[in-house]
Amino acid sequence: MTEMSEKENEPDDAATHTPPGTVSTLQETKLQRFKRSLSLKTILRSKSVENFFLRSGSELKCPTEVLLTPPTPLPPPSPPPASTDRGLPTPTPSPCPVPRPLAPLKPVRLHSFQEHVFKRASPCELCHQLIVGNSKQGLRCKTCKVSVHLWCSEEISHQQCPGKTSTSFRRNFSSPLLVHAPPPACAMNKESPPTGTSGKVDPVYETLRYGTSLALMNRSSFSSTSESPTRSLSERDELTEDGEGSIRSSEEGPGDSVFTAPAESEGSGPEEKSPGQQPPKLPLRKDVGPMYSYVALYKFLPQENNDLALQPGDRIMLVDDSNEDWWKGKIGDRVGFFPANFVQRVRPGENVWRCCQPFSGNKEQGYMSLKENQICVGVSRSKDSDGFIRVSSGKKRGLVPADSLAEI
């Protein structure tokens, strides 16, 4: 026991017997070693973390950094160095892609509705029903002129407004109107058609101009269906009675040339030309002659001075049928206008019949019902063995017994 205690006390004694200078140096070296080990560990850990998050120049980034970090602005390109030698070309800097700033979003234009009283029947844009009423009928957009009901405006007010519609197209025209006033420098040339390199007129332009001219001619030649064409009668009379009647009205339809009366072959004329000065003579129409014979189906009382009164069974010589609803005809010495659906054409070989006894026939079996004094047209030679004649009256056609008909 005494030996062990002695051995344990030996290092203490050695420590106590060591000089104080050596003890301080030993403590300093241990402290330095500990600090070095700590600094080395921290350096290794920091490097490993940096290599993990910032590998090869920020190849991997956390999603938060990608979303939150703003894009680094590129430095402005350095100006090229001024070369002293003018003969050597200066190298142009390669264009680097510059990020374009995003265009600001335009605000969506919505409808701006205001109260409107519609003079014409207008459908609702949402429910497609007519807007009716006397006061405060509905709403209309101030920009695009869209009409809606008061109760339909809430659903359509959040839609985008297309804006003001263009007015380059007009009704009854398939192309924009080319009605620009010519400049004073080229006042003589009213319209210069676009020509190509070869000097030919553009076919598209030619087609559009032809269609526009046809539309204008049709609108000027045909009057409205609700009024009698009194004005066109006076214009035609002035044009046809001028001179010897050689001037033909330009308002007549293209189909009038088919029904032109043949020129008279009489050699009587006010002027006699020498045989050497006789140019090729064109057939001239002195007046619009009768074209076809028609029969009146119904009674028509004249409404204006230039109208022609009709009685059922009257024979009418057609003079002008350029208008679809009002025709010009002649009965004896009377000339005037009458409704086109009040007459029926009488072809060569046909007879005009008047019903003297009413007859009711089955339409499915090919018979036609007639009332008393009704006018119809048919061929007497078409009488079959049973005594029926095939006649027509307006849009109706069928077989009628010959005993109930009387020829006019």
Swiss-Prot record:
Positions of post-translational Phosphoserine modification: S48
GO biological process, one term: positive regulation of voltage-gated calcium channel activity
Subcellular localization, as worded in the UniProt entry: Cytoplasm, Cytosol; Cell membrane; Cell membrane, Sarcolemma
Composition bias, Low complexity: 219-232
GO cellular component terms attached to this protein's record: cytoplasmic side of plasma membrane; cytosol; sarcolemma
Start and end residues of each stretch annotated as Disordered: 1-29, 64-97, 219-286
InterPro entries on file: C1-like_sf, PE/DAG-bd, SH3-like_dom_sf, SH3_domain, STAC1/2/3, Stac2_SH3
PROSITE patterns: SH3 (PS50002), ZF_DAG_PE_1 (PS00479), ZF_DAG_PE_2 (PS50081)
Zinc-finger found in the keyword field: yes
Main location: cytoplasm
Tissues showing expression: Detected in cerebellum, forebrain and midbrain, and in the eye.
Keyword entries, A-Z: Cell membrane, Cytoplasm, Membrane, Metal-binding, Phosphoprotein, Repeat, SH3 domain, Zinc, Zinc-finger
Calcium as UniProt keyword: no
Domain SH3: 289-348, 351-408
Composition skew (Polar residues), residue ranges: 19-29
Record's compositionally biased regions (Pro residues): 70-82
GO MF terms held by the record: zinc ion binding
Zn finger residue spans: Phorbol-ester/DAG-type: 110-161
Assembly, per entry: Interacts (via SH3 domains) with CACNA1S. Interacts (via SH3 domains) with CACNA1C. Has much lower affinity for CACNA1C than for CACNA1S.
General remark: Up-regulated in cerebral ischemia.
Free-text function comment from the UniProt entry: Plays a redundant role in promoting the expression of calcium channel CACNA1S at the cell membrane, and thereby contributes to increased channel activity. Slows down the inactivation rate of the calcium channel CACNA1C.
Protein name as it appears in the record: SH3 and cysteine-rich domain-containing protein 2
Taxonomic source organism: Mus musculus (Mouse)
